[in-house]
Amino acid sequence: PIAGSMVLAAILLKLGGYGIIRMMQALPTTKTDMFLPFIVLALWGATLANLTCLQQTDLKSLIAYSSISHMGLVVATIIIQTPWGLSGAMALMIAHGFTSSALFCLANTTYERTHTRILILTRGFHNILPMATTWWLLANLMNIAIPPTMNFTGELLITSALFNWCPTTIIMLGLSMLITASYSLHMFLSTQMGPTPTNNQTEPTHSREHLLMVLHLTPLMMISLKPELII
């Protein structure tokens, strides 16, 4: 069920991140060197999740692994417990909560018309559903974290915090962001471009679907204009 995926990616996964923030504050202050293995594991896990996204053929699985990769960055920056890191973690959790939920919603819009989640079978929608293609483009650009979205603010703070703590982390962070851009563009091109399937009786998009996307992306735009609400 798509509603379960949206709630899981947008709320439950982020509540786990919030729980880690509260737990880290309750722990006694220890040397940050103690946390090095956990930070390496979190960043390595984020990179592996991104690489898994690149080889996915299932649209829903790709979006789910994308959420996991972003949470790897969040966990890594929560562990070092710097003000910038915690602000970046909160910003990215909220921003990616909206983004991943919107992507799941769009995946369901595609599934209702094609009855498949295989990427190679869901192509050519830019000709018949141009408005849905616009929503796909916006959601994927937010997933890549282009400025001036909240995703960009969160990733910038996370990158700064981790780089100040250990400059070597920029290698894994840079690799992770590069792969994120690759699979996001791959997802957009696979679902929207290419020849239009002739055997599908495609319904036009409904107002309900446009309203859902507006309700996902408008709060994200508003928070981007006033980031001090959450940072």
Curated annotation (Swiss-Prot):
Keywords for this protein: Electron transport, Membrane, Mitochondrion, NAD, Respiratory chain, Translocase, Transmembrane, Transmembrane helix, Transport, Ubiquinone
Location in the cell: Mitochondrion membrane
Record InterPro entries: NADH_UbQ_OxRdtase, ND/Mrp_TM
UniProt GO molecular function: NADH dehydrogenase (ubiquinone) activity; ubiquinone binding
Main location as per UniProt: mitochondrion
TM region(s), chain numbering: 1-21, 34-54, 62-84, 89-111, 128-148, 169-189
Signal peptide: none
Entry's EC annotation: 7.1.1.2
GO biological process: ATP synthesis coupled electron transport; electron transport coupled proton transport
Membrane topology: Multi-pass membrane protein
Catalysed reactions, as listed in the record: a ubiquinone + NADH + 5 H(+)(in) = a ubiquinol + NAD(+) + 4 H(+)(out)
Similarity section: Belongs to the complex I subunit 4 family.
Reported function: Core subunit of the mitochondrial membrane respiratory chain NADH dehydrogenase (Complex I) that is believed to belong to the minimal assembly required for catalysis. Complex I functions in the transfer of electrons from NADH to the respiratory chain. The immediate electron acceptor for the enzyme is believed to be ubiquinone.
PANTHER family per record: NADH-UBIQUINONE OXIDOREDUCTASE CHAIN 4
Protein name from the UniProt record: NADH-ubiquinone oxidoreductase chain 4
Organism: Bothrops erythromelas (Caatinga lance head)
Lineage, broadest ranks: Eukaryota, Metazoa, Chordata, Craniata, Vertebrata
Gene name, Swiss-Prot/TrEMBL: MT-ND4
